Amino acid sequence: MNWTTATCWALLLATAFLCDSCSAKGGRGGARGSARGVRGGARGASRVRVRPAPRYSSSLRVAAAGAAAGAAAGVAAGLATGSGWRRTSGPGELGLEDDENGAMGGNGTDRGVYSYWAWTSGSGSVHSPRICLLLSGTLGALELLRP
């Protein structure tokens, strides 16, 4: 997962976590008993209770927070180990896997164009502490990162 993808997922999940409606009340709250009328009163009513599912459950919020923290940790681990995603060479540029197919008269179907490795790896490590600091500051403000 590259920086852009990790950042987008972390921000998307943090937004979903922050914009979650907290007005849904769980458990036994609100008007009960005779305040509900004859059918919903405590006397003579069945104990079967139909409750609509909440819009977002607590487990979804926990999963979103965990995924955002995991994405931030993955990005930070990539920075710490120095492993980064390398940019692939474009048309007309010499890449790591150039061979006779890239030369004049070649058919241009070498591994550098069609291999999975060429599209998912790059040539150097990426050092951008600003994104890591932004994510850790955001997650720290949300109290999702605990020392």
Curated annotation (Swiss-Prot):
Its main location: membrane. N-glycosylated. Keywords: Amyloid, Cell membrane, Glycoprotein, GPI-anchor, Lipoprotein, Membrane, Prion, Signal. It comes from Rattus norvegicus. Residues 26-43 have a biased composition (Gly residues). Prion-like protein that has PrP(C)-like neuroprotective activity. May act as a modulator for the biological actions of normal and abnormal PrP. One of its GO terms (molecular function) is nucleic acid binding. The lineage of its organism: Eukaryota, Metazoa, Chordata, Craniata, Vertebrata. The gene is Sprn. A lipid is attached at residue 122 (GPI-anchor amidated glycine). GO terms for biological process: protein import into nucleus. This is Shadow of prion protein. Almost exclusively expressed in brain, with weak expression in lung and stomach. It holds the Pfam family Shadoo. Residues 1-24 form the signal peptide. It is a lipid-anchor; GPI-anchor. Residues 26-46 are annotated as: Disordered. Residues 123-147 form a propeptide. Belongs to the SPRN family. InterPro entries: Shadoo. Transmembrane segments: none annotated. Glycans are attached at residue 107. It is found in: Cell membrane. GO terms for cellular component: cytosol; membrane; nucleolus; nucleus; plasma membrane; side of membrane; vesicle.
